[in-house]
């Protein structure tokens, strides 16, 4: 069974936590990686498929329209993730959480419940940080997962929360959660209304850890951890405990190499150039959706760089690859790819117009054929 104590891990992040980011983080020393939050009902709809071309396991929602492709919900690469992937589920129902977890349990290393996300898409159905206001439901979800999923499959169940309004309320909740049978507790050291630009509250991490330790539950702390060097400094000088783990979110989104055990300056240019090139390699290898690739590049590439706009104008992996070839080691542009991108848009427009004309012609042909069928043949008189 996977262990969490003292580990430095990649946070669950919607959009940013897809396969290329997770694999890049693992390649640079992340001990564990979390999947993005997947809602229970969405996962239950999925069909599991083994992608032999990519050697991945894909969870897809079949299309209701035969001409439309299926929707990829989650993709994992067992060769590198099999023992290091924690799957996060968004749920407000013990039954649905259990059903969803059973669907994916054989392809992941553990199940985590999201009880900390304050975004509307999580809380509107009682999920995410809304569960902090319904602790009875949260505890029941965890107990059911431990009983019906974790124990039978020898896989850990964990939960990620935020701080409550008071220290006393937080510690009381931690006691209840640790009594459910979970293996790990992740605490985002900010209250629900706090934003990431605000400094995390770390005054009573030691007391949270004591409760966890008494229940044989490991503790991971999330909030403003920059990289592995910073994590080790927190363990040694602030938390004074090497058994407390750390979770990196925003800094890993901007640069998934922050898990490296060494922080030596790269000889290949600015860190964002190195990260950009490597991320595109991972994205290309695993057929990442162009929208997600562009999102991650918008996080990795500085806004002041001309390449921020160049990548934003791309609409295909081929265009991303072309733009990347123009990127010098120092972050400057070898040539301006604008003309190439404009030609791509012109070709796209021409193809769209050609398809529209062809569609219109088909409609006219179908209309003529329909009118012909409607015409009645008048028989000639028989007495001529």
From Swiss-Prot:
Example of a GO MF term: tRNA dihydrouridine synthase activity
Query: By what name is this protein known?
Result: tRNA-dihydrouridine(20) synthase [NAD(P)+]
- The catalytic residues are 117
Where does the source fall among the domains of life?
Eukaryota
Q: Where is this region: Disordered?
A: 359-384
Pfam families noted in UniProt: Dus
- Describe its assembly: Monomer.
Tell me which cofactor or cofactors this protein depends on: FMN
Gene expressing this chain: SMM1
Q: InterPro entries from the entry?
A: Aldolase_TIM, DUS-like_FMN-bd, DUS_fam, tRNA-DUS-like, tRNA_hU_synthase_CS
Gene3D superfamilies annotated for this entry? Aldolase class I (3.20.20.70)
| Segments of skewed composition (Basic and acidic residues) | 363-374
**Chain positions recorded as FMN binding sites:** 12-14, 88, 160, 188, 222-224, 249-250
Q: Describe the reaction catalysed, as an equation.
A: 5,6-dihydrouridine(20) in tRNA + NADP(+) = uridine(20) in tRNA + NADPH + H(+); 5,6-dihydrouridine(20) in tRNA + NAD(+) = uridine(20) in tRNA + NADH + H(+); a 5,6-dihydrouridine in mRNA + NAD(+) = a uridine in mRNA + NADH + H(+); a 5,6-dihydrouridine in mRNA + NADP(+) = a uridine in mRNA + NADPH + H(+)
List UniProt keywords, sorted A-Z.
Cytoplasm, Flavoprotein, FMN, Glycoprotein, mRNA processing, NAD, NADP, Nucleus, Oxidoreductase, tRNA processing
> What modifications follow translation?
N-glycosylated.
